[in-house]
Regions:
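Short acidic/polar hinge/loop motifs at secondary-structure boundaries
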Residues: 124-152, 469
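Gram-negative outer-membrane beta-barrel transporters
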Residues: 261, 379-386, 498, 502-505, ...
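Structural signature of Gram-negative outer-membrane beta-barrels, strongest in the C-terminal barrel
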Residues: 254-256, 262-263, 267, 289-294, ...
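Flexible loop and strand-edge segments within Gram-negative outer membrane beta-barrel domains
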Residues: 218-222, 238, 257-329, 359-360
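Extracytoplasmic beta-strand/coil segments of soluble accessory domains associated
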Residues: 49, 56, 82-127, 146
């Protein structure tokens, strides 16, 4: 049953919204008044994720949220993106272990969220071999983040396959924008949390650079009780340890062109949850990348390589998953302005080659894909904007080309005013992963037979049985169509309002299902009891595979509010409503159900050296059915979290205390996930701006 948001939470919401107003009443010195005059207003917010080139947010006919670098700096999040991105409307976020985070736009997420593309400065970190994102492998330092852009809705017409339900683009500051800068940061706290980071940037004539290193570790959250009759060994849940190194060097050839080179390394370990059950990623698992860019005006040519090397052990069965993958991508893009700015044409393409060594999919050793796209932003009138685009992709794993169009229109009903009504339709796709196509392994599961003791006269204990899991090379791509109507307004540059209503349908869903069960006439290997007993037990899977099936229809609404109540101080609130999905040719019991209601409210900023943030997040219960069989399916309770930051900044040094889930409400964000509680950490930092800016 869906419950109302508690009155106490609403009281806290009002308190959070009203508190910053007191700051606005403090008399300001000349310096603060100048800062307020220079502070960027909401109508000046620029994004790049909507069309792969810089646009004012007010000119984008799709739903995009922007998390600013200032908000990131003040947030309670120290080591995971879940606490940070949960405040975005329309984005369902789950944390299932100390290191495992998943998120999906405008539909239920899962243990392996496959439909949301995640990038760092336009470089994908999506793992094509399994179709998921390892968030902790983003090799970026908090101090170098410029902003995070979250586009909700199909983005394949711009970014290609796997941007099916949306895009998260983590954008970092360039070395030249950072200038000559040094930062050192360290902290420690509850749940065995400790972290250290260092960042150095500099500018030397035509050269600019930045280098960073970091280390983060945390003990495990508690595992849930043995609710399913299957073993959940506690000893292997070791938390996580994550070293990171990253670097970038730019060379300014002339005013219009430059070269940029980057590379990084990230290590990880800890629990990752999949449809095959939880795996423990071993020590020494790592990801690395290298990138080279040439920019000339609006033209860009890029090459990047992502390398992943990891080993893992399934916690429910003796299944080893070792994966060594390489992604090699070459892309080019350009932009042309025509008819005195009425048409802005954006076009380009890419070719990608993947190599894989997968212990559970030995036949999926290589894959290639390529695509081209064309976008046109047409402004026939100063109050009317049309965006249309199309992309064509080919995959070595899919017969025929994949066509993804989109179109959007935006009207500003009042000349000279920042009010915009938008209507858009778009299509997104997700290509089958290598595992979807080529999985070939046995999963050893277990069933607790001890309830049969009174009948049998002895305790049969746990019975282990094999399930053969097999891929399907004939899978088609998933297709996601979405229609959206929305409204965006900026009032006096200081207040931003946003509304969106959408309906969507995902067809040819890639579903991992059981197509054969053991029976009394075909019992599992090693079954020593009478065969008829199987008729009184939960059905035991014999064979599992993937299929394209049916459709899932979603609809929902999002409301957003932001306001700058004083220089550097902001309050926000947003609400998300998602209707339970409607399904065809699929049993609703086999579909994850997202929370119906989600609500976020918060504030963040700094006043006379005092830095703070406070965010309350509420969400309803959710249903999960994406892991193995019905023994691992169930409902997670509604939850309310309060995250707080309080600190003080001097000229070159700062101290802060950052707390997540302050009230220590114990909850699971997925039915098989860890039990998440409170974490409080203390942090100290040194910052040196050698340019005295």
């Amino acid at each position: 049953m869906r419950r109302m948001i508690p009155i106490t939470i609403m009281t806290l919401v009002l308190s959070l919204l009203l508190t910053p107003l007191a700051f606005a009443a403090i008399p300001q010195g000349q310096e603060e008044q100048e800062e307020q005059e220079q502070e960027q207003s909401y109508e000046e917010t620029v994004v790049v994720s909507a069309s792969r080139f810089e646009q004012l947010l007010m000119d984008v006919p799709v739903s995009i949220s922007v998390i600013t670098g200032e908000f990131i700096k003040n947030s309670a999040s120290t080591g995971n993106y879940a606490d940070l991105l949960r405040s975005v409307p329309g984005l369902n976020v789950t944390q299932t272990s100390a290191r495992d985070t998943n998120m999906t736009s405008r539909q239920a997420t899962s243990t392996l969220a496959t439909s949301q593309l995640v990038m760092v400065d336009g470089r994908t970190v999506y793992q094509d071999f399994f179709g998921f994102v390892l968030w902790e492998l983003l090799p970026v330092n908090r101090d170098e983040l410029a902003q995070i852009e979250v586009q909700r809705g199909p983005s394949s017409a711009v970014w290609g396959a796997n941007a099916m339900t949306g895009v998260v683009n983590v954008i970092t500051k360039s070395p030249r924008a950072m200038g000559n800068w040094t930062s050192i940061r360290a902290g420690a706290g509850e749940i065995g949390t400790s972290f250290f980071s260092a960042l150095q940037s500099g500018v030397r004539d035509k050269f600019s650079y930045k280098f960073s290193g970091a280390y983060y570790q945390q003990d495990p959250w508690p595992r849930p009780s043995n609710f399913s009759g299957a073993a959940f060994p506690d000893a292997v849940n070791r938390g996580t340890a994550q070293p990171k190194f990253d670097g970038r060097v730019d060379y300014q050839i002339n005013q219009d062109s430059n070269l940029s080179f980057g590379g990084g390394y990230t290590g990880t370990n800890g629990i990752i949850f999949t449809g095959l059950g939880p795996f423990d990623i071993a020590d020494g698992s790592s990801a690395s990348y290298m990138r080279a860019d040439y920019n000339n005006g609006d033209a860009n040519v890029r090459f990047f390589a992502n390398i992943l090397d990891a080993e893992s052990q399934n916690l429910l069965s003796p299944l080893i998953l070792n994966f060594a993958t390489g992604t090699y991508d070459f892309s080019a893009k350009n932009m042309t302005v025509a008819q005195e700015g009425k048409h802005v044409l954006n076009y380009g393409g890419n070719y990608r080659h993947l190599t894989n060594e997968l212990s559970i999919a030995p036949d999926g050793d290589t894959r290639s894909e390529g695509g081209v796209y064309l976008q046109d932003n047409w402004a026939p009138h100063e109050q009317f904007l049309i965006n249309a685009g199309v992309r064509l992709d080919t995959f070595s794993s899919i017969d025929g080309a994949v066509f993804t169009p989109r179109i959007g229109m935006q009207v500003r009903p009042f000349a000279g005013e920042d009010h915009a009504i938008r209507v858009s339709w778009g299509r997104g796709t997700r290509a089958p992963s290598v595992i979807n196509n080529h999985l070939n392994t046995f999963i050893f599961n277990s069933l607790d037979l001890s309830p049969l003791t009174p009948v049998l006269g002895f305790n049969p204990g746990l019975f282990a049985f094999p399930i053969f899991a097999e891929g399907n090379p004939g899978l088609k791509q998933e297709t996601h169509d979405q229609f959206e109507v929305g409204y965006r307004a900026v009032i006096n540059g200081k207040v931003s309002l946003d509304f969106a209503y959408y309906v969507s349908e995902t067809t040819d869903n890639i579903d991992f299902y059981t197509d054969q069960y053991f029976t009394m006439f075909d019992p599992p290997p090693g079954w020593a009891l009478p065969g008829f007993i199987l008729n009184f037990l939960p059905a035991l899977p014999k064979h599992m595979t993937y299929r394209n099936i049916g459709s899932i229809k979603n609809q929902g609404m999002e409301l957003g509010f932001q306001a700058r109540v004083a220089p550097g101080n902001e309050i926000f609130a947003n609400y998300t409503w998602q209707k339970d999905p409607e399904v065809e040719e699929i049993d609703l019991a086999d579909v994850n159900l997202p929370p119906t209601n989600r609500f976020n409210v918060g504030m963040a900023g700094s006043v006379r050296g005092l830095m703070y943030s406070a965010v309350v997040a509420y969400q309803d219960e959710a249903f999960w059915s994406d892991v193995l069989d019905s023994r691992f399916h169930g409902v997670t309770d509604k939850m309310t979290t309060l995250n707080l930051t309080l600190g003080y900044e001097l000229e070159n040094i700062n101290f802060s205390v950052r707390a997540t889930n302050v009230t220590n409400q114990l909850f699971q964000q997925h039915y098989v996930g860890d039990v998440i509680g409170r974490r409080v950490v203390a942090e100290a930092g040194l910052n040196f701006d050698w340019d005295n800016r």
